[in-house]
Amino acid sequence: MLMTPGPTAVPEPVRDAMSRELINPDVDPRFREIYDRLTDRLAAVYGVDPSGSGNAGGSGGVGGSEDAARDVVALGGEGILGLEAAVASLVEPGTEVLCLSNGLYGEGFADFVESYGGEATLVAADSDEPLPLDALDEALAADEKDFDVATMVHCETPTGTLNDIGSALDRIAAADAEVLTVVDAVSSLGGVPVPTDRIDVCLGASQKCFSAPPGLATAAVSDRAWAAMEARDPHSLYTNFLPFRDVSDGFPYTHLTTEVVALDAALGLLLDEGLDAVRERHEAAAARCRERGAELGLETVPDPERSSPTVTAFEAPGRAAEIQERLREERDVILATGLGEDAGDVLRVGHMGHNARVDRVDETMDALADVL
């Protein structure tokens, strides 16, 4: 049983959709119909007006950094493509970017910024701490910096931390309303409410809470972010959102047919269930996972109140790889270890998407109890 925090188990209706006749996305009009339906469904999950999903260059939606439209796009590539594409589309030499971080992916934004010639200011806390909001205020108030873009992560998957991005967005807007905001919501979107209407580029991916296979990076993009992209020379062809804003004359490259069909089907299941019901299911699964973990003497990496409804990271100092291997070999349950410096000390349970069910969590924790 696959219980990692992405990729997740893919439900049978999605697998069935993937097995149907393969169509050519470059010449078959049916593909455009599927892609349009996919972006409409994505818009519903993002919480923006489907009429503004941008497939023909349209705009509209519930308000951009509170008042602009949001267009929704889906690029062919894993979720990291979205992070790099956001930077590649907005950053050029000299662009000042504030990277707010308390984990691996927050720091990764700074690496992307520097690789495209931007000036990254990393405002960071330790991976088991909240976002450093006081340090954010200090950075925003510093006279020597005039930030163009700010980046942050909603759910730091390696530590299972759900960040208070609302407070960070408030402080950025109060300090300088012109700063464009980029948020990695890859492991929260679909399982946790995300304030997309306050974010200029909100990033998602197919293999997390949507429970489709890896292969698509999604984004909801504001009008002012599009304007910033159009005002600069492109520094990349593939990692570039702009060609996807208007696909009325075709896609910039051959799209990933099977992945588009799969995500469309997965989003259909999610919306049929209802966003509120899906989020309640994630909360219930997370609560059961932590309750069962506490019974086994396991502690979460962040404080429980900062743990994400989509993933639980348990402390397992020096034992994570051993426990992971025994679970796989003895019980056919697959969990993830930590990443980076925490790789050997953290064991992660992904209760997101199709896996956000109490019965699946109970089966997982029963297996974990047997090997501890």
Please name every model-derived segment.
Residues 89-146:
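PLP-dependent aminotransferase-like
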Residues 131-186:
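Active-site phosphate-binding strand-loop segment of PLP-dependent enzymes
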Residues 10, 207-291:
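Active-site C-terminal subdomain of aminotransferase-like
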Residues 299-330:
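Conserved PLP-binding catalytic core of the aspartate aminotransferase-like
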Residues 196-207:
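Conserved active-site segment immediately N-terminal to the catalytic lysine
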Residues 347-372:
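PLP-dependent enzyme catalytic core of the Aspartate aminotransferase-like
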Residues 39-40, 69-99, 105-110:
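Conserved beta-loop-alpha segment that forms the PLP phosphate-binding cup at the N-terminus of a helix
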Residues 1-54, 58, 63-73:
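A glycine-/small-polar-enriched, mobile loop at the entrance of the PLP active site in fold-type I
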